[in-house]
Structures are given as C-alpha cells and as structure tokens.
Amino acid sequence: MSTERDSETTFDEDSQPNDEVVPYSDDETEDELDDQGSAVEPEQNRVNREAEENREPFRKECTWQVKANDRKYHEQPHFMNTKFLCIKESKYANNAIKTYKYNAFTFIPMNLFEQFKRAANLYFLALLILQAVPQISTLAWYTTLVPLLVVLGVTAIKDLVDDVARHKMDKEINNRTCEVIKDGRFKVAKWKEIQVGDVIRLKKNDFVPADILLLSSSEPNSLCYVETAELDGETNLKFKMSLEITDQYLQREDTLATFDGFIECEEPNNRLDKFTGTLFWRNTSFPLDADKILLRGCVIRNTDFCHGLVIFAGADTKIMKNSGKTRFKRTKIDYLMNYMVYTIFVVLILLSAGLAIGHAYWEAQVGNSSWYLYDGEDDTPSYRGFLIFWGYIIVLNTMVPISLYVSVEVIRLGQSHFINWDLQMYYAEKDTPAKARTTTLNEQLGQIHYIFSDKTGTLTQNIMTFKKCCINGQIYGDHRDASQHNHNKIEQVDFSWNTYADGKLAFYDHYLIEQIQSGKEPEVRQFFFLLAVCHTVMVDRTDGQLNYQAASPDEGALVNAARNFGFAFLARTQNTITISELGTERTYNVLAILDFNSDRKRMSIIVRTPEGNIKLYCKGADTVIYERLHRMNPTKQETQDALDIFANETLRTLCLCYKEIEEKEFTEWNKKFMAASVASTNRDEALDKVYEEIEKDLILLGATAIEDKLQDGVPETISKLAKADIKIWVLTGDKKETAENIGFACELLTEDTTICYGEDINSLLHARMENQRNRGGVYAKFAPPVQESFFPPGGNRALIITGSWLNEILLEKKTKRNKILKLKFPRTEEERRMRTQSKRRLEAKKEQRQKNFVDLACECSAVICCRVTPKQKAMVVDLVKRYKKAITLAIGDGANDVNMIKTAHIGVGISGQEGMQAVMSSDYSFAQFRYLQRLLLVHGRWSYIRMCKFLRYFFYKNFAFTLVHFWYSFFNGYSAQTAYEDWFITLYNVLYTSLPVLLMGLLDQDVSDKLSLRFPGLYIVGQRDLLFNYKRFFVSLLHGVLTSMILFFIPLGAYLQTVGQDGEAPSDYQSFAVTIASALVITVNFQIGLDTSYWTFVNAFSIFGSIALYFGIMFDFHSAGIHVLFPSAFQFTGTASNALRQPYIWLTIILAVAVCLLPVVAIRFLSMTIWPSESDKIQKHRKRLKAEEQWQRRQQVFRRGVSTRRSAYAFSHQRGYADLISSGRSIRKKRSPLDAIVADGTAEYRRTGDS
C-alpha cells in the first residue's frame, strides 16, 4: 500500500442510480480497520529472500509478535506499557482471567461508589447530609437513612452473591491444568501459569485454555475437531487444521521443544471468525487464517491429542474480548419514568421555594413580633427562609420515591420468571423452553408496532426436502396439487437397488429412476453427479453408514438426494474427491474450490476427471447463474418456466451448470488463483475477483426444487398479530418470488392485497421528492409539515422490494470508479469547502428520501424485503426506529439475523437448524414462531398493564403521603414541621405500603390469557401509551393531592372543637398525627384493592396484612417499654392507645377513608358504564365467554395456484468448508452425525411431456 496518500486519487460515485447490491460484510465490528488496500499481494515462492522482503510491509497491519518457546522475548522493555505513574506491565496478558469486580478490601467502597453513581441514591445521600445540620432539619436522621440502607443493602447483597459466584468460577478455571513445554519436555501446569509463546498439548475432551495456533494433532494431516458451544452456542463439531509444514515436522516432543517459529498477526480483537497472520519459520513465510486457530472456550472432540502455540492469553483472547460492550436496551416506560421523576423534583423545588418565601413573610409579620417564639438567634427573615427551603427539601423528599427503581427491578425479575415457566411456550420435541434472556424489557413487549422477521427457519421449518427438479428442460416430480390426497395410489420409488440410499427420501417419479438407470439422457446423470461433487460437505462413516455435515440445510438435502439417486459422495482428501456413480467408485482430482458467500450466491468446483479432462461445476441462485451462461443454451427458457412453476409452489430453487476448461486456460487462471490465495490483505475480495474470471460461458443443466414447509401455527399467529395492529415486515435473503409465495402461504398477503414493487416505489418517491423540492427543497426545515399520503384511503396494500432496489431508493449505491475524478484529500480551502457542501447536500437528500420511503412502507399492511444482506436488515430496522419513533421487534434464527436482532428494541431468537448465534444475541428466545403471539399478546400485555398500574399507584401513594406536610405548613408558620411521627415516615414505603403494590405489579391481569389471545385488539392500549403517559401521571398527581387534602382537613376539622369521653380535648399534635397516618395507610391499601383486577389470597393477605402490620408496629413503638430504652427516638409514648380508644377518632378515620374512596368508586362505575373500554366489556361478559367453545386452530395449508412466479433461494449467509478442504485435510471416520440431515418428507409426483 502506497504511503504517498496526498497524491492519491479516486473516483466518485455515478450520479445515476445503480441497482447493484453493495457487498456488505456480515460480521463487521468496531475493531476492523476502516481503510484497507485493495491490491492483491504477489504470489510468494517460499524462499528465504522473498520471505524476508514480505515480512516488513506485513508488520504495518499485523503488529502482534509471538516467539515460540521464548518467554524472555515477550518481556523486553519495548513490550512494556505504563499502567500508572511509573508502574509498568507487559503488553502480553497472562492467562489468568478475572471476571469478578471486588475483593474483601474493595467490596464496600467500590460497591458504594457504584451505587452512588445513580442519581437517586446520590440525591438521598445529599439529603442525609442536610439532615445532619440542626438549623435545617426537623426530621430525625433515620427517616432517610433506614430506607436508603434498605435500598443499598438489597443491591449490595445481590452484587455480593453474584461476585462470590464469579470468584469461585474464576478460581476453578484458572486452576485447570494442561501440559506445557518447559525445560525441553511437557510438564503439567495450571492455566493461569500459561504465557504467550508457550507450546501446549491438549487431549480429547479438554477445554482450550487460550487462543492457540494448531501445530499438529493425532489425526491424519493434523485435523482437529472442536465443539464451540461456549463461543456461539452450536453443538455440531467444527474442523480446524494445521499448516502442512507444522504437521510434517512438529509431531514429536523434542521437535516441539526446539520449535522457534516467529508469528506476526493482528492485535487482539473480538472477531471470532477472522484471523490474519503469518508464520515465519525455516526461512519461509506461511499465511495463517481462522481455520488454523483454536479459540479459548472450545472443547477438543474426537481427537486424541493436539499441540498448539499460544497466540493470545487471558484477557486478550477473543472470548474475553466479546464479554463486554453489551448494548444496553431501555424501555419507553424507563425514559418516561425518568422524566416524571425529574418533573417531581422540579415540583419539589418549587413547593419548597414557595413555602420558604411564605416562612420569610410569616417571620417578618408574626414571628419577630411574638416574644414566645424567640429562639435566641437574631437571623433575618430572608436567612430563615433560606434555611427553611432546605428544611422542606428534606421534609418533602418522599415525593421522589427512593424505592421506585428497586421495586421496578423486582417486578421485572418476577415477570421474566413467568415467561421462563410458561409451559405453553415449551417445545417438547426439542426440550426447549421459552427464555427471557434479559429482565429489563418485559413491559415493552406490550407496545410493539412493527415486527421484522426472517423467513427461512423463522416462518419456515428450515428442514429441507428434495421435492422436484428440472433436467434438460424436463420436469421430474409430483404434478398433483397439495389438496389432492392420493399419495397412497402411487407407489413410492424403491431405492433398495442403491446400497448407499438412506431410506429417508420419499419420491414418487419412477420415470426419473428409469432415466438414470438407462443412461439414455447423459444430462440426467451429469445433473446428479454435479450435486455429488460440487459442495463443501464433510463425510464420515458410523456403523457403516455415511454421515454428512453441511454448511447449510439446503446443501445437505442436495447431497443426500444425489446419494439416493445413485451418486454418493464417499470421501475426500486434500486433492481428491471420491464418488460412487451407480455403484462404481471413481476418484477425481480437485483443482480448486470456489466457495460460496452471501454476495456471490453460488459456489463452483474445478476437477480433473480420470480421463484427464478439466471441468468446472457450478450451482447457485438463478439470478447470478443466468448472467454467466453461454449464449447458446437451448433449454434456458424451459428451465425458466420450470422455475416459475416451482416458485408458485413455494419451493426453494437453484440452478446447476458446468463448463469444460482447456489446460492452457486453467494454467493461466490458476496462477492468479494461487496469488490471491496467499494475499495478506483483502484476501476475500481478491479471490472473488479471480472467481469471476473463470465462472463464465456456463452450460445450463437444470434446476433443483427443495421444500421448506411453514412452521405450525404461522398463519394463525400472523393473523392475530395483524388484528393487534402490529405490522409485520419479512426480511429475507431469498428470491422475490419465493418470499412472495410464502407471504401468501402464511396469509401475510391475501387475494385482496395490492402489491407494489420496487419500480412502483421509485416513481412514487421521485414524485414526492419533486413536490418537496417545489415547496422549498430538502432544506425547507422551517416550512409547516404537510401530511401527504402516498396511496388513496382504503384498500389493502403490500410492498415487495429487493435489496438492489433498496440500495437505489435509499441512495446506498455501490461506488463507481469511472466517472467523477476527485482528490481523496482536498489540498485547498476552496476544495475543502466545496466537498463539505456537497456532502451536506447529499446527506440531506439521502435523509429525506429515507424518511419518504419509511412513510410509504408504513402505509402498507405488509412489507417483504428480498435478497437483503444482514447489514441491510439492520439498516431497515434502524430506519423505522429513527423516522417513525415506533417500538420494533426483530425475530430470526440464524447468524445473518444477529445484526437486526441487536438493532431492534426487542430481539427474539428462535433456536432452530442454524445454530444458536441468534439466540445468544437475543433478549428473548423460544423454539417456534407461533409462541410469539403468546409472548406479546399475553406476557407483553400483562407486563405493560402491571407496570403501568404499579407506577401510577406508586406516584399516587407518595403524593398522598407527602403533601399532607404541605397543607400542615399553612398552620405551623411554614416551619418545616412534619405531620407524622418520624418512624412512620421511615417505614411507610418500606413496610406499610410496599407488598401490595409489588404483588399487583407481579400478579394482576385484567383478562385471562385465553381471552387475551382471543381478542388481540386489547393489545392496542400499549401501542398507544394509553395506560401510562403524562396525562395519567398528572391525574395520579391530582388524585394524590386531593387525597392528602381530605386526609388532612377532615381530621383537622374534627379536632378543632372536640371533647373526648373523658371530657378532655384530644386535639394534641401526636393524636392528630396518629389519626392522619391511620387514615392514610387504610386509604392507600384499600385504593390498591380498587385497582386490582385479579384477586388471589396473596393479594388480599398483603392488603389486610399491611394494615395489621401498621397497627401492630405503631402500638409497639408507642409503648412505654421501648421509650424507656430509647427515649430520644420514641417520643409518642402512649399516643396510639390513648387516641384510638376514642370512638370519635375512629369515626374520623372512617369518614376520611370513605370520602377518599367513594368518589373513586363512583367515577369507576360511571366510566365502565358509559365509556367502557374493550377490557371492561370483556370482563363484564367473561363468564359467558369462558363457557363458550374455544376457538379451533385452522389447519395449516399452502395456498397454491395464486400466480406463476419464478423462484430462487439464497444459501445461508456463511462460507462452507472450502478453505479446510483445499488445505489438504482428509476427514476422519469417527464423526458425529449430520445435524441437519434430511427429514422424512413427501415428494410430489409430476411429469411433463417432452419438451
């Protein structure tokens, strides 16, 4: 890469739209380099001189250096980094891991520091300090300290338990042992003693202790089998292999002890599937990639032993690099709740300021002229008002609820357990329960507006069955419609003549077998031979049976189909592949494997036949294959027609083709291929470019059709979610026609749906942009917004758009380098200014076009995006989040869905056939798409209702409690005197009112789960934020204000001129405080009873138990015995017994409670009678509804014959095993069975006439 960057020139993008899809990387992270050179490095000829020449430029990108068996090398001064002041530590981490936060000395200070970083805790700490100032505080210090200690203590105990568990886990892991080369031989050492550069030996079933370079193993060609469940959740075995040179020379202990290889590689990062480096040894350089690295956390399987060199240790390993930087998601209610707390704090400041002004005025008018109020201080009224301001901040501090956040977390934790325990979301077939992987998002499940779903494996089963094929223009398979149930009338094809048949494929077209056996049409045999040879499947034998492991379920189905039709893939080595062709074993030399990726959408293999001919066999999506066909292909149109038929039946298709290659052509191409294979930078891009040169002028053989059935309950689930006003977008890598037909099959699209395509959308967006430009352009930010609709009102519309159209519409075109020449780095101020203005114009235009697209798409009832990459999926989700401010949910099952799952507000992973990456990145997971309706319509809705009720009640009870002080201040000279006993203030939120509201937040439900599913329209209240918003908040505030007025003024009126039974007036302050407190506790607990919709014994016990607990504690605290022990803390001696023995006091309490509650009862009655909600109506008739017959699920059927659409499918978004295969590693016989083996299926019977 040139360093003369100032003179470097590039070309800007073309001004015209380009429909070519941008080749995104599926797994980009923040650790990747932004700018990389595109030049292909020349082929290395493996001699010392060129190795040394290539070593220096390689260091510019690969700066991590490892010397084998040389610990002193890594301790050199230039590898030391300054940690603190003069304390230095090595750049290379040791292998001891530390996941715990605290030790015995740091726990208390660090935990307190972390907790006081939260604003609420810091606020109450400041109040506690203010209470220590006697001139300010009228409250005892413990009124704030006890609640604060409870909150801090609960959190500290939870943190301590978690950290102790981490300590134990770290100790257990760090003390594991393995064998390390020391003093020339292997010795047992603990993991924590391992260092970078050590050579270690691992045995079968051992965990890999660090990221190591595989040097050799007990397997042929040093192949090593590993299980990566701790890394990506996948339990199927993966394959790693060493370099050929290390396999050859590093098998014995003595050679391993003298190994002095030097490695330069990338710095530690979090990319699990990427590694770039070079080994320099024996005067030669060898490129290294991820297939040669064993990562920490893997388990050695089916391999007796292996040797490795430690590259990254401890905190530098990839699994540890991935343990942090988790994206923290917060709910809409979280943000709203925080704003409301800020609002309460502002109200607190204003009330305190007003009362302080009142006190200053009162002091000037009354206090200074009343000799009996003189306290010996000659402070001015304004200064006294200043002190009283802080006094009221303390007295009214309970307006800001200290226990709110702790209570919310407890409720969310309980709701998460309810999801985990729900047996109706348990999938018995795979023993997979639903799992809430986060506890912070439950109520947001009740507010979803848009669902973004993958198709394959999410809506469908991802179990592939070979169904039909088209060979040389002839269609083979079942021609009957799915509605015709006459399978029994046609005999299933008998594959008993084939010794390699697995007996699982159900096929009904006997004519195809006749064609294969007769050999009359050589294209038929060529077709199945291609399926048997063009793949990256791995094979082994178990009990005499062939077991295949494929990179995707599609590929496994195709290889199994070829096996059943007489072309069985038997074995492969570095340079050969062995096929049984109708019982005859033939071995072919493999010259090159052109592997699949999500941008190429195809794979090829180049082989030399035993006769010496060179052939290329290719399979891929029809869109890319047809672009590369030779112009003379007589069956091209017939195959297109067959693809249309397959698409109409929602079958997944791909095309097969081949070409013969001349020896000279291959020799020239192979040189370029070898050069690209050893490139140190941009290796993948270089290989793709070379692949393009050979994959052209192909001859079409035919097409395959694979069935991927819908999961059970998908149409019903989509129907119910649509009735809940949730819009569903399907984002898939499949061909447009396949996705469209699946849309009809799952009833996302109907006969009444008007479908808009990319070209329609483009014209609509262009017209909208013109209108906006005429009104002032994209910069007309201050013009009044004009709400326009893209479509006339009425009608059911859907949008189907491909990834290429999406790029064009959103101005995400691939850069063309043949139009506008510009300087990469402007050298003058004018150039810099012009470039900045150009960027701003383009960005504004892009933003406006994106907004218009989102507005248009959201007017449709359904959206299907086809042929989209993982990055495009995430981009679509982000656009809806950004411009519609709507709550989004993304659901998928594969690694290509991880980006959108992380981008959406809620991510749901389905544990299916494509591993566990989606599940591990998700917030919630389960096994079937149909469980989504229960997650949202039952658990999500319940959680939302419960949280809203909890918050409204919590704010209400705190205002009712606190504002009594406000009213009391008008009668005590605004002196910040409290209206309650100090211990009542301390325990009110902790004991007297905490349990009922917690139980309501955990258990309440307005209607049952069955009725929630039966009436999806109930879900709308969460989408519209009807149960918790600023209006509801101020209603709760007003309710609390009125309650506090009633609770204060009724007892005040009763006490003004009252004589008790003993002839004495009970109008002392302490009796007055007891009366208000008693009425308050009864009122707020009965109020929660009015708010409770679902009664259980636990709810009733908590309400009446809280009231009983209040009276029990009050009588104890007012007893003479406790006053004798703590005279200064308990000063209400005998007050409860003296006051509450007066019938007039009880009458006052009952009157206050009744006046508080009866208006609420009346309003609720009138509201339910005159303006009933949907929930009210269902509750009113719930007995009748419960007695009615439950709705029956409709049988899932595919809707055939909707229209004739051509279909093709995309492979899964991951590479296969081509790198491993071409690196020369034969496959060991002992292997686990194929995970995605083709299941029993029903093939269709179809035969067309001769073309």
From Swiss-Prot:
Cysteines joined through disulfide linkages: none
CDD domains cross-referenced by the UniProt entry: P-type_ATPase_APLT_Dnf-like
Chief localisation class: membrane
Effect of residue 892 to R: In PFIC1 and BRIC1
Residues modified to Phosphoserine: 1223
GO MF, any single term: phosphatidylcholine floppase activity
Residues in compartment: Cytoplasmic: 1-108, 157-340, 412-949, 1003-1032, 1092-1097, 1164-1251
Pfam family name, one: PhoLip_ATPase_C
Reaction catalysis annotation: ATP + H2O + phospholipidSide 1 = ADP + phosphate + phospholipidSide 2; a 1,2-diacyl-sn-glycero-3-phosphocholine(out) + ATP + H2O = a 1,2-diacyl-sn-glycero-3-phosphocholine(in) + ADP + phosphate + H(+); a 1,2-diacyl-sn-glycero-3-phospho-L-serine(out) + ATP + H2O = a 1,2-diacyl-sn-glycero-3-phospho-L-serine(in) + ADP + phosphate + H(+)
Record-annotated active site: 454 (4-aspartylphosphate intermediate)
Positions on the Exoplasmic loop side per record topology: 131-136, 363-389, 971-982, 1055-1068, 1119-1138
Mutagenesis / variant outcome for changing residue 203 to E: In ICP1; uncertain significance
Membrane-spanning residues: 109-130, 137-156, 341-362, 390-411, 950-970, 983-1002, 1033-1054, 1069-1091, 1098-1118, 1139-1163
Subunit structure of this chain's protein: Component of a P4-ATPase flippase complex which consists of a catalytic alpha subunit ATP8B1 and an accessory beta subunit TMEM30A. The flippase ATP8B1:TMEM30A complex can form an intermediate phosphoenzyme in vitro. Also interacts with beta subunit TMEM30B.
Protein name: Phospholipid-transporting ATPase IC
Organism: Homo sapiens
Gene (name only): ATP8B1
